[in-house]
Every structure is written in C-alpha cells, then in structure tokens.
C-alpha cells in the first residue's frame, strides 16, 4: 500500500497563497473588435480556444454567442502549468527501496494537485510503458495511487531513448524525472530542450552497504548478469572513485536544471520543500 506523507497537507497549505502561474495573459490573435474593447473584463483575463481536455463548464457561452467559437476564460489565479512526472519502473528501482520511492512520487503529486497544478504521469523502462494523463485537483489522487500501484518494476533502463521520445511526443515545459539513473550514457545534453527539469536521483551510496565478506557477488537486476568483486580497501577506493565520476555528471549549475539526490536514510519532506521553493522562486 502506498502511503502519502502526513506532512504534505500542511506543506501544500503553506504554499497555497503563493503563485508560480503566468504573470501575463495569453494573447488571442484575432482582429475581432471584441478583444480590443477598452474597459471590458476581457482585458483582465486570458482567452484561449477550447481544447479537448478542457471542462465543458469552463466555456464562455456569451463569448460563443458573439464569435461563434468556443473559448475558455482563465483568470490570472486560474492559470497553471502542466507538470510531466516521468517515473522509472525498471528492475533496478527495488534495490533502492520500492516503498520509499513510491511514497515520494505519490506525496509530491499530492502536493502538486493540492496547489492546482495539472499532472501528466508516464512510466518507463527502455521505452515509455504506461501513462496517466490530465490529472487535475486533489480529488484525482486515487488515479495517481492506482497508476503507481500498477508499476511492475522490470526491464532495462534507456533514459537517452526515453527522454528523446518524451521531448518529441509531448514537448513538456516542466519535467520531473524520478530515477536511479542507471544509464551510463545519460548526460545533461540529453536534458536540453526542456525549459525546466528536476532530476530526482534515488541513490544508494556504496559506503552505505554492509559488506562483511572478502568477496562480493553483485547481480545486475536489469541484465541478470553476476559479477564477483573483491572486498578490500583498494577495491573499495576504486569503486568509490568510479561512483564520484558517475555523480559528477549531474552536479552542474545551469538555468532551469535542478538536481536532487535522495537516499533511503534521508527525510522526504525537506525535498518537497526545496522543490516548491524552487518553483515559487
């Protein structure tokens, strides 16, 4: 059973009065004089054409009567972003800890829905596996939990291919990637093309492992290959050096790029707070 952190309700209330929404309305390109009227309420709103995912109740029927076209009126406080949550469901994730991982994703999604963001969730291995799209309002949290609970965690990771597919198919503005990043080919260049990326790295450091024998048998959950390694100071130093090289790819300062490293021993709530502070900055 996936449990949402109890602090999420309080965290979402604290940020509810802030705004990360668009500061200016979306312009409607039209020569119809109705959009040029001075002193009318139209100058205070964003107007856009109706799209299939919109609620029919949001259609401005008075405007339809004047223009014979369907428009949605959005007040400043109603405009929000659509976040894409890309969830790794490959076989290596349970090594980190399935419960911690799913709790984190579910809790962050809960907060976003409480703050009236729209979510699109995609799971992946070496390809996109499943989706749960256009999730709105906190009443839809059962959809999030059902989606996460259905993940099977098998198969290999191919982040390079998946990121390319997401970029070409969906063109998201803000992307949250939840993964252990088990793809040595992945670099920050593969994250270009997204205006804002949150890379949430679920990481198990080598130093946290309790190793008591002189040799270690390591199994790659994704390939099912086994490797026998010596457990001595020289071998440990070499592994830790490779680990630092691996992590070094992600410690970059770049506009719109945010890297957070999570470990099973770390509290989750401070990470929710950091993400929200970044969004509301």
Where are these predicted regions, by residue range?
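Short, surface-exposed recognition loops or helix-turn segments adjacent to catalytic cores
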Residues: 120-136, 147, 156-164, 179
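Long, highly charged amphipathic alpha-helices
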Residues: 103-107, 143, 245
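Alpha-helix C-terminal capping segments
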Residues: 93, 162-170, 186-194, 250-254
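An amphipathic, basic-hydrophobic helix/alpha-beta surface used to engage anionic
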Residues: 1-133, 174-176, 184, 190
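Structural motif
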Residues: 89, 177-182, 203, 263
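Short, electropositive alpha-helical surface patch
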Residues: 137-146, 253-259
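Von Willebrand factor type A / integrin I
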Residues: 1-26, 30-35, 189-281
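Von Willebrand factor
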Residues: 139-174, 185, 201-204
